[in-house]
């Protein structure tokens, strides 16, 4: 039976359409109500091993799927008006050689003036990839069991996640100086107590630098083909504060739909906007799915 977070459907409905884009608010904002904070399952480490193993499986499985991505990133002016927008709609499919590529369906000229966003930024979900907590990386994190929470029809275990690098000043400084720094997830995850897999995450990418900031995002997942919990909706509404004194109010909404198992390799190339008749011309290489690491414009 297909299992789905009702919150995903509600949020997507509320945020569809141009008018709604001006009035939408973050779903489930603030601190959630968590029960059984003092108690804990008998095998917390076993639960962590189980859901991080599932993360590894999901990452590999997603490499065999095509899907549609609709990304809207907006800057918000004082008073709540939209001051700029980046809107990119794409379909990720496979060519005859098994390479997945991004076919741009809609990409009007961005109107942002405060920050710049590249195609590569769009692949970086708030600074981290969708499956940041896979088995090979759990040694990089500390997990703290918080309690149990019911989300719609699902009972979940709740964990706070902290990258160990934040406590290592020398390594942290080196990462910030790197031209291609590794990103980590810091935040909270909700794990389905039946399937032991992440169904929701809230957090951000770290470390940040003086010129590169990440919004706090919330990601919901949906069960695809009866077994894979893939991200289907990501939302952020946050202020990015740069050392220069500039503050940017950023709103982001990304939807993943129309998953179809096609098989292939996860080497992704990019194709042009259909509206510009460039469908048959592969462009520069690009990473796999997922949103932004905004940088202030000079």
Could you tell me what each predicted segment is?
Residues 1-4:
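Positively charged n-region of N-terminal signal peptides that target proteins for export
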Residues 7-16:
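Bacterial N-terminal signal peptides
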Residues 17-21:
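Sec/Tat signal peptide C-region and signal peptidase I cleavage site
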Residues 22-185, 193-200, 204-215, 223-233, ...:
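Structured extracytoplasmic
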